[in-house]
Amino acid sequence: MPTINQLVRKPRKSKVEKSKSPALNVGYNSHKKVQTNVSSPQKRGVATRVGTMTPKKPNSALRKFARVRLSNLIEVTAYIPGIGHNLQEHSVVLLRGGRVKDLPGVRYHIVRGALDTAGVTDRKQGRSKYGTKKPKA
């Protein structure tokens, strides 16, 4: 336990919270070619590679992912949620934060139904999460 005098000389430091989606906290000034500290809830990017990867143990599947070059020139791996997708190389996608627990290194999700990404077809429940329009009654 420190004395009052020790605390006066050297106060306690507050913990610095590390971001779980650091690529969303960086902007880019293309005129000056410098990165800036601009936080944003989503970012636009171009898919450079689309493929599948296998999850960690004990799960088994082929999870769809895309390697995306963001508008701030950072390249990240993002998960494509839902059943089926229309993404290919050079598709323009919208990214949000949110990791996939059983895929190491995947910290971002692609937003379905935005930009070049189509919503999930034939989806009746939880449509807003997958960019599906309301079906005609």
Curated annotation (Swiss-Prot):
Modified sites of kind 3-methylthioaspartic acid: 102
Any one GO CC term of the record: small ribosomal subunit
Keywords: Methylation, Ribonucleoprotein, Ribosomal protein, RNA-binding, rRNA-binding, tRNA-binding
Spans annotated as Disordered: 1-57
Gene Ontology molecular functions: rRNA binding; structural constituent of ribosome; tRNA binding
InterPro entries given in the database record: NA-bd_OB-fold (IPR012340), Ribosomal_uS12 (IPR006032), Ribosomal_uS12_bac (IPR005679)
GO BP of this protein: translation
PROSITE patterns the UniProt entry points to: RIBOSOMAL_S12 (PS00055)
Pfam families xref list: Ribosom_S12_S23
Family: Belongs to the universal ribosomal protein uS12 family.
HAMAP family: Ribosomal_uS12_B
Oligomer status and interactors: Part of the 30S ribosomal subunit. Contacts proteins S8 and S17. May interact with IF1 in the 30S initiation complex.
Task performed by this protein: With S4 and S5 plays an important role in translational accuracy.
Name of the protein this chain belongs to: Small ribosomal subunit protein uS12
Source species of the chain: Streptococcus sanguinis (strain SK36)
Lineage of the species this protein comes from: Bacteria, Bacillati, Bacillota, Bacilli, Lactobacillales
Gene: rpsL
